[in-house]
Curated annotation (Swiss-Prot):
Disruption phenotype: SPRED2 knockout results in a dwarf phenotype characterized by reduced growth and body weight, shorter tibia length, and narrower growth plates as compared with wild-type mice. Mutant animals regularly develop kyphosis and scoliosis, and show craniofacial defects, splenomegaly, and cardiac hypertrophy with arrhythmias. The lineage of its organism: Eukaryota, Metazoa, Chordata, Craniata, Vertebrata. One of its GO terms (cellular component) is transport vesicle membrane. This is Sprouty-related, EVH1 domain-containing protein 2. GO terms for biological process: negative regulation of epithelial to mesenchymal transition; negative regulation of ERK1 and ERK2 cascade; negative regulation of intracellular signal transduction; negative regulation of lens fiber cell differentiation; negative regulation of MAPK cascade; negative regulation of transforming growth factor beta receptor signaling pathway; positive regulation of DNA damage response, signal transduction by p53 class mediator. Residues 5-122 form the WH1 domain. The keyword Cell membrane applies. InterPro entries: KBD, PH-like_dom_sf, SPRE_EVH1, Sprouty, WH1/EVH1_dom. Negatively regulates Ras signaling pathways and downstream activation of MAP kinases. Recruits and translocates NF1 to the cell membrane, thereby enabling NF1-dependent hydrolysis of active GTP-bound Ras to inactive GDP-bound Ras. Inhibits fibroblast growth factor (FGF)-induced retinal lens fiber differentiation, probably by inhibiting FGF-mediated phosphorylation of ERK1/2. Inhibits TGFB-induced epithelial-to-mesenchymal transition in lens epithelial cells. It is a peripheral membrane protein.
Amino acid sequence: MTEETHPDDDSYIVRVKAVVMTRDDSSGGWFPQEGGGISRVGVCKVMHPEGNGRSGFLIHGERQKDKLVVLECYVRKDLVYTKANPTFHHWKVDNRKFGLTFQSPADARAFDRGVRKAIEDLIEGSTTSSSTLHNEAELGDDDVFTTATDSSSNSSQKREPTTRTISSPTSCEHRKIYTLDPYPMDHYHPDQRLPRSYPQVTFPEDDEEIVRINPREKIWMTGYEDYRHAPVRGKYLDTTEDADSYVRFAKGEVPKHEYTYPYVDSSDFGFGEDPKGSVIKTQPPRAKSRRRKENGERSRCVYCRDMFNHEENRRGHCQDAPDAVRTCIRRVSCMWCADSMLYHCMSDPEGDYTDPCSCDTSDEKFCLRWMALIALSFLAPCMCCYLPLRACHRCGVMCRCCGGKHKAAA
């Protein structure tokens, strides 16, 4: 790969972090492209390579450590996209195979929706920016990362001058945008740091809400750390500042105790009694429980990486969370027999196979798969119990008495 294409950040539909993989047909496995490493991969809108004046979509991947372009693939209508597992997806275009290993299932779902959106726009022939770019309502607030920039890329870039030239995604005209800078660049020496106004945060003296702010928290995870034990990302924090910025806290007056102790008259103590023997049994009222803070706060789930509210967290809300009832149903109905048969007899070269009870008639092995399952049910009659038990489980999930629950990251 070369360092030729550098799309604008504003032209991306979706952009995530992943490891670019390549397919080796000789060994039948997937291997990291160009030695591996975390890359910024996204679906962006570019001018069509054929030069017919129409716009197209490009899957562009750039490795972070050396800015090397390791993936360039134009999206076409005949693109075959496969979701092998929650964190590994691959696709095929013109006998070329590409794969991505994501850091979390949420990133994988966001990239999948971005590719499907690009294919839909190609099929419909829509090239307007309003129907393709920044469709946050359809892609979701937690999954799409179109304007986020990590600190590693910020530190490697130099300060831009006050006049910049940008290009519109749907036009070839160049326009200049003039920004008013309160500190002119020629007023300072090159090695002098520009003054910066630090934000000031004042916490209210209410003890019910406790705000935790970590200014060094990054919106992107770095390295290969497990996404289930990754630090909670600050979704609503402004991460445009450099990593060395900090938050100044305005200290208010120290709140005083409001405990009122009962007054005991000296006449209550007898002359023959020891004053130390009288104990005040009235305790001050306990402070308000902080359960409200736990119920009202939002956290990120370790399973699906989505934000959730503790107050609304019930069973069946997280599809990626472990479900003991569903696991028990699969074991009782011996569904492992069907999985083993489909893996050895009806899987593709990558080892992927359709769900045993899928009713998708577009599958070319639909009839063959169901005939094999019926024949296998004569050897394992308990497989016939799977469909009614699965239907009961779905009813339980709808009633919020079965299913997995979100779990907050530590």
